[in-house]
Amino acid sequence: DAYDAGPGVALTLGVGSATVGSTLNGYFQSYVTAHTRNSVAVTAPNLNTQGAASAGAGYELTVAANFTEEVTAINGGQSDFKITGGRFDLFLDKSPDYSFGGDSGFTNDGSILTGTVVGGGGNFTTFPFFSFGGALIDIQIDSYDPDVFSPDTIASGLSVFTLQITPNNANFLAGVSSVLGHPYTASSDLLVVADGNLDLYAVPEPLSLLLVGSVGAGLLVLRRLRG
């Protein structure tokens, strides 16, 4: 199974003043636009992708995640860090109402897939005209809705979440002042736009989440730790 996410927002706090040993907190939220199975689109006429801009009919699938990281090295424009914790949730909301500008509607109703971030690491590099970075984050799946996901797939499958990062999308970010309740301060924080998709495979592999981003391109891969 594959779930394609629309443009989302990722916020990392305190980037501007970070030093070696600093602990930073990050947050991400988005919504699912399509579902495919064996590379074939699954008909989902009731999947609402318009959020608060719609009449609220059908249902929506939203993603909410948080993570903590410790800066381990700074060398010029490059910062290295290790991931120390966090959480990932996929929500099924029967009253579509997500809003990036209102920072609301992403965690309504129940989570159908929940995971705990248990480790990882990566780096972020800034150049005069572009930036790129990446992280490998290990996630333990804690729970899932068996009415939505096959138990065999959840028990031993491989999940891959790819994410394209476009941090200079000023029009999209213009109305965003917070993510998951955490205010954005331009002078100290990093706020980016991100597109992604979640792939679920029935393959016995550990689950980890790899984030490789650049201005305009990036990759976020999620591989599940066997429970």
How should these model regions be labeled?
Residues L225-G227:
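Membrane-interface capping segments at transmembrane-helix boundaries
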Residues P204-R223:
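A short, hydrophobic C-terminal helix/tail in secreted or cell-surface proteins
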Residues D1-A202:
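Extracytosolic secretory-pathway proteins
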